[in-house]
Amino acid sequence: MKNIYKDTLLIGQTDFDMRAGLKDKEPVIQEMWDAKKIYDQKQKLNEGKPLFMLHDGPPYANGDLHIGHALNKTLKDMIIRWKNANGYLAPFIMGWDTHGLPIETAVTKMGIDRKQTPAVEFRDMCKDYALKQVANQANQFKRLGIFSNSDVKYVTLTHDFEVSELRLFQKMYEKEMVYKALKPIYWSPSSESALAESEIEYKDVKSPTIFVAMKVVEGNAKIDTDTEIVIWTTTPWTIPSNQMAAVGENIEYNIVKANDRKFILASSLVNKVAEQIGWETFEILDTLKGPEIVGVKYAHPLYEQKINPVVIGHHVTDEAGTGIVHTAGGFGEDDYIIVKQHGIEPFAPIDDQGKFTNEIAEFDEKLVGVFYEDANKIVGMDLEAKQRLLKLKFVSHSYPHDWRTKKPVIYRCTSQWFIGLDKAKNQILANVDQITTKPEWAKKRLYQVLEDRTDWTISRQRLWGVPIVAFYDQNDKLVLNNEILAFAIDKIAELGTNAWFDKPADTFLPEAYRNKNLKKEKDILDVWFDSGSSAIALSERFKNLPLPYDLYLEGNDQYRGWFNASMINSTIYSGKSPYKKLISHGMTVDEKGNKMSKSLGNGIDPIEFANTQGADILRLWVASTDYTDDQKIGPEIIKQIGESYRKIRNTMRFILANLFDFDPSKDYQTNLTEVDRYALNNLSVVKNKASEAYDNLSYNQVYNLVVNYVTKDLSSFYLDFIKDILYIEKNDSIRRRQVQTVLYEQLWMLIDLLRPILIHTIEEVYQAMVNLNKTDSVHLLDNKKQDFIESNEFVTKWNNIMVLRDDVNKALEIAREQKIINKGFEATVKVCLKDEFKNIESTTELEKIFIVNSLSFTNDCSGLSEQKIAFVGVELKNGTKCERCWGIFDTLINNEICERCNSVVESL
């Protein structure tokens, strides 16, 4: 092309880079947001609008963020941004969970001995460590672009939060729902503390299982003293604590002769037990019911001087074992209930570290100080020596573990604080019935977990946490009432929780209870009680944030955790659910579906990712996933996301470049051609669908709609054919301004739909827009109303034109293969429409839309190839190519350019 004509083309221009450079640009954009306080500005702008409150579940303040944190916070961030741009005041108050064992452990790893360090000094170290972790994580969330003010947050260690939590404890106590009792609970020797059900996870382990024969010493009319009762257990270490044997009231039992010994076991299990123990032959001597065995006494299998009874057990079945249950009241919930029913105190000679105490010395001195797991071997050898061991076998089975230390836990009878749920259970379940959930099955799951939940163990034997406010006399008898509790909590509100650990008990007691040598409780509240109080603490701190909140969104591991604790606490506190809607998301896994772990080397550090590839790419990945299921992420998936990002970015760059001379205040056109109206109709359809998907929190639908729109509606259609108009037409021609008007609306549509996702890129787009009266940030704007929906008749016609376009393109492809033409603009196209599509013939600009030289309609279909809605023929246009627009014409001015181009050139 001659330079003179090249220079007359209106080639687009923009400062918006083709290369993203997100790792460098994003921090700069974030600094601008911080400097101009964009989040605070938006909250101010939205004052008076309806409140939308998403309550942020607090991540634990220990260590750097992982990919699961990024997924969770990005999902929340997209919700908040969408709501703020669509008529709501939607604050994002982030929270942190800051008490508990992991922080204590982190401090002790710094060389601090918890037991040798003064309590307040140790607690201050924990606080300092936790606050550093909060600051670190807050900065990392900022790098991911979270729309919040990190100065306005909630942290469970702050004074106001701790006092709010204690007021909740007080309210529960006043409702007579808090009690202290000796009960078997989950105990973690590795963390030396009680655990709640929500802190338990199950893992497969190999354990010894044993069949034990216990000799009858006091029989009855049916059972002689030469008979032996057979029990089976997976915890041999509990045999020293055996207090009873339990039989089922409606279970049938046999007396069986095998190897010249007589054994009692459930009839239905005889064959199975015989096979497991290795009885080659056996004989059924008698049959009897469970109650006929009750009252029989047997010698303890290890300590023959200890005589124990046979009793009825409500929990006994004949589905496994022997149908007779070894009962140790100190190490099992059902066992505890049974021994208490018979007036016997549970025997639990295991200390906080899982070692046998001196209580066992009366029977077996060698066990004192032995770790419970190590006792399995000792017990097995002793049973074998006494000929009480019938069979030992190792089996794999699911066993409870401490969710923090990942080590096994035991059931252990200790004195703990509990919240009794009986009074509130019906209201809790009624509240669950009222919420909506995503996925739908989530409601049933939460309901089941709460329905099955037993009383909540809320005490922990640690230092770093909120103290349980209670007192004891010199005989360790509990001294507590409403007056004492109210006074003590008021005093803590004045002095802070640290005071509880270093000031005398009298400081916290009403005058009438002082000088009585009372002692303070040493236990602290469960961290789930902390985080489960967060909705209440927030509603008390911000009076304009009443319960219930609109939304809770966390991982699907929180049904037994935060979802659960929050529902219990809020119901007891206010009678209400803390949330109207609950959403759970899956876990992040690698591309093969494997859980991410350091050992597999398949983890993805979100901050490292943001600093190399950009937070916007990570956010686009989040939007692309069905988050209700586990989300896969890895190199191939990220590559696909990167390709989608480039399509989106290049499309917006093209639009920006071709709006360089468009001033919407002067050049915006309302009288548009049919194809422009069709493009705007499609824009509105997609935006409406995507907006509905946003409202339904279905971000993968938004992602698919936008990527499909960019690829098909824009790149493959509208943006393709308008290049001729944009580049060739006179700069201020009506037709060019019409097309630019459509581009302007298309850009705003992409801005609105991508603003919650590609937060940095859309800011960059906005700042690159010209001839616009701009505000500080795109994130201060509300979504633009874009209602361009056309009639069904109009849309049907244009949908058919798109089908005709496909028909023409197929014919052009055949013509290219047959060497009739090289390019579409060389083609003369003849179309014979099928009868029901004749209304297309009146449409103008079709040759431009189809990017051909000319297009004509005929009623003579002969010689044309049949396609979907038309018969199409293609011929080569004979003529000369215009040096400016490349169109083929019969004649050119000066043998160089066409009349249209000449008129444009002459006007320059």
Swiss-Prot record:
E.C. no: 6.1.1.5
Protein's UniProt keywords contain Cytoplasm: yes
CDD domains reported in the protein's UniProt record: Anticodon_Ia_Ile_BEm
Catalytic reactions of this protein: tRNA(Ile) + L-isoleucine + ATP = L-isoleucyl-tRNA(Ile) + AMP + diphosphate
UniProt note: domains: IleRS has two distinct active sites: one for aminoacylation and one for editing. The misactivated valine is translocated from the active site to the editing site, which sterically excludes the correctly activated isoleucine. The single editing site contains two valyl binding pockets, one specific for each substrate (Val-AMP or Val-tRNA(Ile)).
Classification via PANTHER family: ISOLEUCINE--TRNA LIGASE, MITOCHONDRIAL, SOLEUCYL-TRNA SYNTHETASE
Name of this protein: Isoleucine--tRNA ligase
Origin species: Mesoplasma florum (strain ATCC 33453 / NBRC 100688 / NCTC 11704 / L1) (Acholeplasma florum)
Gene this protein is translated from: ileS
